């Protein structure tokens, strides 16, 4: 069990200090995305390291994907809105993430992985959050799990908003 799983739930609210606009960039083999949380903000937002949003109807913006690259000491959580992305890593994990699905990867002591589109046309859209691991967990064994949309608990608020719970509990749904 990771130390983060033992942490008490957040008990107090914080005020918004500033609104920060994302900026257009590319990563991997040229995937166009919007970077919302950046290295400049990492110390202020730990454990949140980075948040990228990607989305395009033009396959040229995403088709090359994210070829083999290393990670260590943090987790990535990817949520797909549209499209299909294949994950493979050096620890032997593999999976395909489809619309509404979530992929959770703990890099721990280190992993080399790739994320390559499983499509050649159509919309590809989603976002990826990077979470810093506590110091005690930075050298843990790499771990991977993907969840299809049908496996994730969801509900609608009284106002009609759709909520999908990808971690923890929301309104007694977990």
Report each predicted region and the residues it spans:
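Ligand-binding loop in jelly-roll beta-barrel domains
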Residues: 108-137
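Hydrophobic alpha-helical membrane-insertion signals
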Residues: 2-35
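"Short basic amphipathic alpha-helical interaction patches in structured regions
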Residues: 91-98, 117-119, 143-146
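A short glycine-rich, His/Asp/Glu-containing loop-to-beta-strand
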Residues: 26-81, 152-174
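A short beta-strand-loop-beta hairpin characteristic of the jelly-roll/cupin
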Residues: 63, 78-98, 108, 112
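A short secondary-structure junction signal
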Residues: 139-145, 173-174
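Short, structured patches in soluble enzyme cores that scaffold and shape functional sites
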Residues: 128-135, 148, 165-169
């Amino acid at each position: 069990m990771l130390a983060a799983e033992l942490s008490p739930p957040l008990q107090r609210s914080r005020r918004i200090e500033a609104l920060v606009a994302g900026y257009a960039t590319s990563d991997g083999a040229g995937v166009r995305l919007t970077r919302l949380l950046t290295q400049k903000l990492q110390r202020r937002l730990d454990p949140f390291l980075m948040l990228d949003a990607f989305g395009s109807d033009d396959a040229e913006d995403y088709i090359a994907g994210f070829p083999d690259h290393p990670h260590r000491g943090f987790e990535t959580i990817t949520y797909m809105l549209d499209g299909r992305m294949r994950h493979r890593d050096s620890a032997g994990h593999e999976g395909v993430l489809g619309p509404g699905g979530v992929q959770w990867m703990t890099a721990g002591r280190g992993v080399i992985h790739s994320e390559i589109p499983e499509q050649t046309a159509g919309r590809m859209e989603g976002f990826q959050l990077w979470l810093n691991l506590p110091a005690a967990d930075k050298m843990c064994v790499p771990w991977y799990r993907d969840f299809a949309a049908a496996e994730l608990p969801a509900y609608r608020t009284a106002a009609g908003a759709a909520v999908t719970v990808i971690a923890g509990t929301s309104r007694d749904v977990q």
